[in-house]
């Protein structure tokens, strides 16, 4: 990954990713109390985005299949958004065999990876 690469802020504001929300709330409190400058809080959040993205890229090894009814889809600024109703997730590699999880609705946000955005092939040589 290049030194100037930017990372998406998906995990900060999601109401389902509590660690990002808790981090943002804690940093806001520290800024309000005058314990840290806003610039430091921004650096912490940027590192959080980078670390979480890298962790998901390297650490997730399970395969998941999603079935459901595609309700809405859109493409804006190279970011795809899909809303799927009545999704069924079949997760392989979870314990012995596979596990099925269902829900009422999910939102999937898909972006180009750093390599794809730079025009490189995934898995190719890196500088």
Curated annotation (Swiss-Prot):
Ranges in coiled-coil conformation: none
Main subcellular localisation: nucleus
Record's Pfam families?
TFIIA_gamma_C, TFIIA_gamma_N
GO cellular component terms, alphabetically, are: transcription factor TFIIA complex
Q: Which Gene3D superfamilies is this protein grouped with?
A: Transcription factor IIA (TFIIA), beta-barrel domain, Transcription factor IIA gamma subunit, alpha-helical domain
Q: Name one GO molecular function term.
A: RNA polymerase II core promoter sequence-specific DNA binding
User: Which residues pair up as cystines?
Assistant: none
Which Gene Ontology biological process is one annotated for this entry? positive regulation of transcription initiation by RNA polymerase II
Q: Which domain of life is it from?
A: Eukaryota
- Keyword terms, alphabetized: Nucleus, Transcription, Transcription regulation
Q: Where in the cell is it found?
A: Nucleus
Task: Quote the InterPro entries the UniProt record gives.
Answer: TFIIA_a-hlx (IPR009083), TFIIA_b-brl (IPR009088), TFIIA_gsu (IPR003194), TFIIA_gsu_C (IPR015871), TFIIA_gsu_N (IPR015872)
Cite the record's note on assembly. Answer: TFIIA is a heterodimer composed of the large TOA1 and the small TOA2 subunits.
Family membership noted in the UniProt record:
Belongs to the TFIIA subunit 2 family.
What role does it play? Answer: TFIIA is a component of the transcription machinery of RNA polymerase II and plays an important role in transcriptional activation. TFIIA in a complex with tbp mediates transcriptional activity.
Q: What is this protein called?
A: Transcription initiation factor IIA subunit 2
């Amino acid at each position: 990954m290049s030194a100037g690469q930017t990372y998406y802020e998906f995990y900060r504001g999601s109401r389902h990713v509590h660690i990002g929300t808790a981090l943002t709330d804690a940093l806001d409190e520290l800024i309000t109390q005058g314990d840290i400058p806003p610039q430091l809080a921004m650096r912490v959040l940027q590192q959080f985005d980078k670390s979480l993205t890298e962790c998901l890229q390297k650490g997730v090894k399970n395969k998941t299949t999603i079935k459901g009814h595609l309700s809405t889809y859109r493409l804006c600024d190279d970011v795809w958004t899909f809303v799927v109703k009545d999704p069924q997730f079949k997760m392989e590699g979870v314990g012995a065999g596979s596990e099925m999880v269902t829900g009422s609705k999910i939102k999937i946000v898909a972006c180009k990876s750093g390599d794809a955005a730079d025009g490189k092939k995934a898995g190719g040589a890196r500088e």
